[in-house]
Amino acid sequence: MHAVQRQIAEQLKVQPPFADQNALQAEVARRVNFIKECLQNARLKTLVLGISGGVDSLTAGLLAQRAVKELRESTGDNAYRFIAVRLPYVVQADEHEAQASVDFIEPDERHTINIGSSVKALAAEVKAFDGLPATSVDFVLGNTKARMRMVAQYTVAGAYHGLVIGTDHAAEAVMGFFTKFGDGACDLAPLSGLVKNQVRAIARHFGAPESLVEKVPTADLEDLSPGKPDEASHGVTYAEIDAFLHGEPVREEAFRIICETYAKTQHKRELPYAP
């Protein structure tokens, strides 16, 4: 393992590869217990998570639903619940997969909040967009969509006195592949430290359909590049990112891209700068 790989892996608290099925099961139990402890320590009984249709929110949702189920069983308190929220922007192209994810999770409650009108209303008020290239406006509004989704989730959580779950994991964190104060904002991040193939392995452990587990990851935030795969944005594959984080050799170009991207996105992984 290169020293830089070791340093980054330590900073992101990357978990080692699952040695076997027992190790995977133990990690699932540890993360379910983590979620339960977060709720109990906060003296709250509701979890809220936006379900996009990707494997990250699918896996986080499965962990959350199991956590509240176990809390109900162990405490006898049926007030513990998990709310899955669909947050489409107008019409979502992969709505079928998103609904399939929600159906498989079987959350206690499911809500739908369309963020389209809110994002468009805000965009209409921003005079700074005047004269900007369409691609620049599209990129900025992509981040606005992510932040609006988090606003919606926190609004639901506030109404139900709950905590918001995030879906960030090590393979996204190392690339800074999240919107600051958007999908990067949450109360607890149960996938933290996992690489992408571990997130998929946990989804499979729950019996999730392979079509959802292996669905091509996409943030799908930009109207001018609908459904753009994450890997096209990264310039490297998730397999290469996972290998890098686990100290395995990767091609020279992938090593360079990951290290440079990690350095320039450091501000996204820190608290606001202060004097």
Swiss-Prot record:
ATP binds at residues 50-57, 167, 196, 218. Pathway: Cofactor biosynthesis; NAD(+) biosynthesis; NAD(+) from deamido-NAD(+) (ammonia route): step 1/1. Gene3D superfamilies: HUPs (3.40.50.620). It catalyses: deamido-NAD(+) + NH4(+) + ATP = AMP + diphosphate + NAD(+) + H(+). The keyword Transmembrane helix does not apply. Pfam families: NAD_synthase. This is NH(3)-dependent NAD(+) synthetase. The lineage of its organism: Bacteria, Pseudomonadati, Pseudomonadota, Gammaproteobacteria, Pseudomonadales.
